[in-house]
Amino acid sequence: MTLQIIAGRSGTGKTTYLMDEVSVKIKQNSKTYIFIVPDQMTFQMETSFLNKENLEGMLGTQIFSFSRLAWKILQETGGLSKTFLSQTGIEMVIRKAALDQRDKLKIFSRATSRKGFYAELANLFKEMKQEEVSIEDMVKSATNLSTSVNNKIHDISIIYQKYEELLADKFLENEDYLRLLAEKITESDYLNQTEIVIDGFTSFSQQELTVIGALMRKCDKVTVSLALNVPEIKHGLDEYSMFKASTEAYYALLELAKLNSINVEEDKFFLENKRAKTESLAFLANAWGHNKFMAFKEEPHNLSVHQANNRRAEIEGVAREIRQLTLNGYRYQDMAILTRNLGDYDVLCETVMESYNIPIFIDKKRAMSKHPFIEFIRSSLDAILFNWKYEPIFQAVKTEFFFGVAEKSSVLRRKADILENYVLENGIQNKWKWEKEGDWIYRKIRGLSTNVLPQTDGEIQTQSIINEMRSLIVNPLSTLELNLKKAKTGMEFALALYHFLEQVNAVERLESWRQRAEEQGYLELAREHEQAWSAISALLDEFVEVLGKETLDLNSFVEIIATGLDALEFSLLPPSLDQVVLSDMENAKLLDMKVIFAIGMNDGVMPLRQKDNGILSDQDRDALRAEVSNLKPSAKNNIGEEDLLAYKIISLPSDKLFLSYPAADEEGKVLSESNYLRKIKGQFKKLSESVYLTDPGLLSDAEQSSYIRSKQATLGLLTSQLQMYKRGYPLSSVWWDAYNSYFENGKESRMAKQVLSSLYYENKTKPLQEKTAKNLFGETIHASVSRMEKFFSCEFQHFAQYGLKLEERGHFQLQAVDMGEIFHGAMEWISAELKRNNLDWGSLTDQECRQMAKLAMTFLAPKIQHEILLSSKRMEYIQYKLLQIITRATTVLNEQAKSSAFRPVGLEVDFGLKGDIPPLKISLQANSELLLQGRIDRIDMAEQEDRTFLRIIDYKSSSHDLALTEVYYGLALQMLTYLDIVVTNAQKMIGKTAEPAGVLYFHMHNQYVQAEKELSDEAIVKELQKNSKMKGLILSDPVAVSLMDTTLEKGKSSNIVPAEIKQNGELSARSKTATREEFDKMRHFVRHKYQEAGNKILDGAVSINPYKLKERTPCQFCGFRSFCGFDPSLASNQYRHLTNEKTETILAKMNIEGGEQ
């Protein structure tokens, strides 16, 4: 029974010596030789043995980690009768323990719902077992500490005790195996006549030391290899040394040997670096960690430092280096990429390496949480927990597990989209609405549904799809909820979930995905689908095993299962024989590597800027370690560990070391280089730093040629270089050679043409062919005024909405257009009610105005947007505010009518083929025509002797005025069109001809009067009248004006219309008026604009040409922005800049362009 320690820095040949020693001994005796290495190194050590010359296979030699050795010995001695708990199971049990003790927690009661909390607790409990720290010691130590620490340890204690109670000596964790191993080693026959070699560790936990002590007592010899600085053993421990942990391990092993009366052979020290093949790498490895500054005066061959623009440029630079190294004879398996922050690089590396045709193995387990099956389970449980809210329901729906396997996915997705649109538009946000008896009724309703028409065939077909999909969701989800709410124990809850997964045929869905992935060659994806079901089965089995008899409620079950789902990970396949390995620095499973790329060497990353991420802060640990010395030290006392990690990286390669860092992150934030890089550059005075650029155009031709390493990656660079060339920048001949090379091969030529076509890309549309235009819009264009205004706003917007019939997804929310519908509907209803009762505007009292408004709102509220105004308390309040506006508008209109001779003769008057008035017909080219149809809010009439006047009033929920500039550009055609139609059809409407009296906007809003002193009721009414003055354009005729405001006096302004009378009885310049001749010119011009638009539509005009008038553009509220891709930064995408001009100028232009129609 002997202990021997082999010591020396990394790369000095310790592992090679041990393997050689064993190879000699195997031939000399029949002993068993066991190598114990860290978990992540077992595969690499086995591979090294197999590749070892003169070693006759593995006979007589076994490679174990501590945990694998525990399995082996416990299988032999009978210590495996208890059930093993995975990390997932541990976190679920901890969550159950925390939930049970939640009311007793002093600090962690809120943290129990925080994601990651249970993983942190699991890590702390793991540490306690590894370091043989009892909870009693923790509690005792915390007694004399601050209240904060004491409360924290109190919470940890009661959760830990409940956790141990739930395990109840029936279950084992990884750490329990080492405890049992230490107990069972003496009973093992397998360890008789055995020598143990322990290699690859820098430190040992207390549990591992206990196991090593038992092995010392049992086995013939225990040899331990430690990477440490030999002088520190001889001259004393340096508190901040990177070898502090291994030096402490050295002394702990000697103390163990002494306690167990074990013979200690003389230490064997290795001093010379044998791994590094160049002086520079050997110097760097030997000098690292020395307090004394050491400088390398020669040119440092095979050591390089690179700055990159960003992480992508960095990885592309690494990829180019790898490609060059393979041309020089290296294999991919000779190289590894190491980083401290793997999460910043894994996806990027996978993408870039694929474009360079470099096989890569990413040594990182991926969380299962994003797999559709896991998301389906989580979302289904959340749907039940949150009363069938939209978000979790459709997160589950989109995984496709509710639907049959037989039907095509594309068909199912289309149907699911139809269902989702219906649910969103109808505000279906709870279980009651989902389970409500009877079919859901589908009608394509826009605005007020006062006149319900029979369903169309299309609506009936859509309704059928909606109810089909609804039943596929409701049936299994209702069953799941029923079973979960009946469940009392963990077993019953788990069975409810399992039966739900059976009901939706989850296994068949996963199997179909697996088969399809295999057929398409996506083997890794196929394995993930296979693992997903296995993982859930194991999770439920483990849940039942541990918590099956525990009493639970629904919330607790969902929280515990969610914790388990968060902990699930996909297992990794070992790397193939020839792949580049990407790994994080701390867990790299590497032994002998020729080339290392250490990436992401930034300040704060290497060395790591320490943060308190665990349950116990650094301050907590420092305070507790005064009495619980086995507890791991705080981060600030582990400074040497960062130096050691860097040392492992720089001492790993035998041939080449590439060190790199990005100068900026993805958002352009500046990143500094690591202090370690500054230190290395200080030691190597002749070490020059090169740059990995995104754009190599500034480099020399020779340097640019190094960027050409693969056809796919080079094509992207070539495109960007040619783009710069188009802008006038010089282009190296290197890129012309690359360009020509793509057209020497047919397949590559096709790919190049497709990619390089982007050089000539312009975001422009081509006019539709005549036939296509007529198919989309018809030879006779049936259009509304707003449609034509949209065409003049942007031709492509018109094409998207009226040609392609694209629609924005409807949502169950009250929008401005809905409020406009309510206001129009209310005014129509009140006017109709007055007519039914033989009453006129102006004859109502204030009380009657309020009553009318209330009755109108009562009638309209259930008829807008699927009863949205009745759907919630918030909507009830909005309804109240809308009622205030309608009441105010009714009162104002009533007061205006008292002072006006104009009376309504038409409300919500339809014009069109089926309207009260015929459509406005506009002749177009090629014998086509445009039929204009729509609805006029209100038509007023007044008579004076032999003259009859007609005017248009439009109700608006926001302030509007008639701007002739907007009329001229076709953006505001509505009011003058309506005026033209009623004047043209006056004989049909009122039985006589009429003159145009004007167009006015009535702003419906809840106005307030501001005053410095208290006002009488009469004064308040006058102020409200003044604030409610209608805007627009009226006839420049004193007679017409006097009919609009019968109270208007000389020298006064009207409170009703935009008019002011001078003392001489004429209209002032401040009045917004136009002559009869000007109105006629405007009417003719408007018809001309419709003709212009109609002809352009038939010509296939679909240009992306939004206007810009001051700061206003149609893009601001356009639902098709992502579709058209309009980008003002492109030369091909520019606004049509419109300018405001004087009224006289605009009228002159209208006269010239409009002419007589």
Curated annotation (Swiss-Prot):
Extra remark beyond the main annotation: Despite having conserved helicase domains, this subunit does not have helicase activity.
E.C. no: 3.1.-.-
GO molecular-function terms, A-Z: 4 iron, 4 sulfur cluster binding; 5'-3' exonuclease activity; ATP binding; double-stranded DNA binding; helicase activity; metal ion binding
Pfam families in UniProt: ADDB_N, PDDEXK_1, UvrD_C
Family of the protein in this entry: Belongs to the helicase family. AddB/RexB type 1 subfamily.
Gene3D superfamilies: 3.90.320.10, 6.10.140.1030, P-loop containing nucleotide triphosphate hydrolases (3.40.50.300)
Superkingdom of the source species: Bacteria
Residue stretches making up the UvrD-like helicase C-terminal domain: 272-590
UniProt keyword Lyase, yes or no: no
Protein name: ATP-dependent helicase/deoxyribonuclease subunit B
Function, as annotated: The heterodimer acts as both an ATP-dependent DNA helicase and an ATP-dependent, dual-direction single-stranded exonuclease. Recognizes the chi site generating a DNA molecule suitable for the initiation of homologous recombination. The AddB subunit has 5' -> 3' nuclease activity but not helicase activity.
Free-text comment on the cofactor: Binds 1 [4Fe-4S] cluster.
Entry-linked NCBIfam families: addB_Gpos
Subunit structure: Heterodimer of AddA and AddB.
Domain UvrD-like helicase ATP-binding residue range list: 1-278
Biological processes annotated in GO: double-strand break repair via homologous recombination
Lineage, opening ranks: Bacteria, Bacillati, Bacillota, Bacilli, Bacillales
Binding site for ATP: G8, R9, S10, G11, T12, G13, K14, T15
PROSITE patterns assigned to the protein according to its UniProt record, in alphabetical order: UVRD_HELICASE_ATP_BIND (PS51198), UVRD_HELICASE_CTER (PS51217)
Keywords for this protein: 4Fe-4S, ATP-binding, DNA damage, DNA repair, DNA-binding, Exonuclease, Helicase, Hydrolase, Iron, Iron-sulfur, Metal-binding, Nuclease, Nucleotide-binding
Binding site for [4Fe-4S] cluster: C794, C1115, C1118, C1124
Xref: SUPFAM superfamilies: P-loop containing nucleoside triphosphate hydrolases
Species of origin: Listeria monocytogenes serotype 4b (strain F2365)
Cofactor: Mg(2+); [4Fe-4S] cluster
